[in-house]
Design a protein with these regions (language model features):
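Class I SAM-dependent methyltransferase SAM/SAH-binding core
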Residues: 48, 56-105
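Conserved alpha-helix/loop element of class I SAM-dependent methyltransferases that forms part
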Residues: 25-44
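A conserved beta-strand element that flanks and buttresses the S-adenosyl-L-methionine
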Residues: 117
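Core SAM-dependent methyltransferase catalytic element
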Residues: 201-221
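A short glycine-rich, Lys/Arg-flanked "PGG" loop and its adjoining helix->strand segment in the class I
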Residues: 130-141
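N-terminal, positively charged/glycine-rich alpha-helical extensions of SAM-dependent methyltransferases
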Residues: 1-18
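C-terminal alpha-helical "lid/dimerization" subdomain adjacent to the S-adenosyl-L-methionine
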Residues: 150-198, 204-206
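Conserved beta-strand signature within the Rossmann-like core of class I S-adenosyl-L-methionine
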Residues: 143-149
């Protein structure tokens, strides 16, 4: 199946609220736990989360790592609005900064972060090289980086099977988004080519489920 682009931003308030209300606890906590297992020495500093959505992952990082501050970046105000409420409710307004920006327009200094993470932003990007360039630019030399995203299946039929397997009980708007996201995602081979073009081929890239891949490692100098 060829890649089919979906909208870069989730701007519909109904769509964003449905996403914020959905139960991604297992996947999101697994992402944080994976980071801690891969980079056990990382315990303090500034972490940036690209495509933070409603800020569940920034909140989980702050709870897991008390000496870490998080800058969450998302291009959609509709997604950040529930995120700001969640950060306030968690009592983490002093440690979580939420910024509305579209890559490459974040405007932060090169090497300004001690760690870079992103879960499920890449498939929204029409030009993936922009994403990887920002990962390389924002993290300082040796910074841990962890990126996870969907893997594009071989056919639309397989994509529908995955949606029904993992989202059967979710609202139709989320099931539709999941299907479109699978079609917009990249294959493992495509991601490895992107990493090579960005000078990030030292990052490891592997499948971790039937629908997710991760790329991880320390950023080059």
């Amino acid at each position: 199946m060829n890649r089919v682009l979906e909208p870069e931003l989730m701007t519909d308030p109904e769509q964003a609220e449905a996403y914020a209300a959905a139960d991604f606890a297992t996947v999101n906590q697994g992402f944080v736990d994976r980071f801690r297992a891969l980079f056990p020495a990382f315990a303090r500093g500034r972490l940036v989360d690209l495509g933070c959505g409603p800020a569940d992952i920034p909140i989980r990082f702050c709870r897991a790592l008390p000496a870490v501050t998080v800058t969450g970046v998302d291009g959609s105000e509709a997604m950040l609005a529930p995120g700001r409420r969640a950060v306030g409710a968690a009592g983490l307004a002093g440690r979580v900064e939420l910024v509305r920006a579209r890559l490459p327009g974040l405007g932060r200094a090169p090497g300004g972060f001690h760690a870079v993470v992103s879960n499920s932003l890449l498939h929204h990007m029409p030009h993936p090289d922009v994403f990887w360039s920002e990962v390389a630019r924002l993290g300082r030399a040796g910074a841990p980086a962890l990126v996870m995203d969907l893997h594009r299946p071989e056919s639309s039929e397989r994509a529908r099977e995955i949606v029904e397997t993992y989202s059967a009980g979710e609202p139709e708007v989320l099931k539709r988004d999941f299907f479109h996201s699978l079609r917009a995602a990249f294959t493992l081979a495509e991601v490895r080519s992107q990493l090579a073009r960005a000078g990030l081929d030292r990052l490891r890239c592997e499948m971790v489920s039937d629908r997710h891949w991760v790329a991880w490692g320390q950023l080059p100098s």
